[in-house]
């Protein structure tokens, strides 16, 4: 059986073929950053919905009013979810250069922007609510996901999420003469 891959070009091929209903463009701009911008924009026309999570409106969020487009002929519903800049939120980042950093929040976030993690938690809570109310298909992965471990109170916690991903001690442990709490 052929496996489905999730590489950039394969995802957009499936969009062109009408095999994907939606896409979240999270902090990226596929309308102009892929190998074929016209194909990417045409693929987005075939989606039912597009979530553009970014600092500002960009070519992806506004693909429907791009060159040669007739907005009345494009049915894709676009949702703009404004997120914070990297200096306004705490958390880790990684890139294709294979380096990682932990950043602490600097200035207060601007306006109604939110950290990516807060957006993800709000979406997951809303999806869970729908699954419970509407008897969603295959509910175990959705309802069983331990998002409470991602949170501190009612907000997303990058530190707690890092612990979930990397592991942590449940009690004080000394290894090689170093105490871990």
Model regions: which residues?
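Non-catalytic alpha/beta scaffold blocks inside enzyme catalytic domains
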Residues: 1-166, 171
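Non-catalytic, alpha-helical, charged scaffold/linker segments
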Residues: 146, 173-175, 179-181
């Amino acid at each position: 059986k052929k496996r489905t891959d999730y590489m950039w070009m394969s995802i957009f091929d499936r969009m062109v073929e009408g095999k994907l209903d939606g896409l979240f463009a999270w902090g990226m701009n596929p309308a102009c950053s892929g190998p074929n911008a016209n194909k990417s924009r045409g693929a987005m026309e075939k989606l039912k919905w597009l979530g553009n999570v970014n600092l500002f409106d960009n070519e992806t969020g506004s693909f429907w009013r791009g060159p040669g487009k007739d907005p009345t002929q494009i049915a894709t519903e676009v949702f703009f979810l404004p997120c914070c800049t990297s200096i306004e939120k705490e958390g880790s980042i990684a890139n294709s250069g294979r380096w990682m950093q932990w950043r602490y929040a600097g200035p207060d976030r601007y306006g109604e922007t939110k950290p990516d993690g807060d957006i993800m938690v709000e979406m997951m809570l809303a999806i869970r609510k729908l699954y419970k109310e509407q008897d969603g298909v295959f509910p175990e992965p959705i309802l069983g996901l331990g998002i409470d471990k991602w949170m501190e109170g009612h907000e997303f916690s990058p530190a707690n999420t890092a612990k979930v991903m990397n592991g942590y001690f449940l009690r004080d442990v000394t290894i090689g003469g170093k105490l871990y709490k």
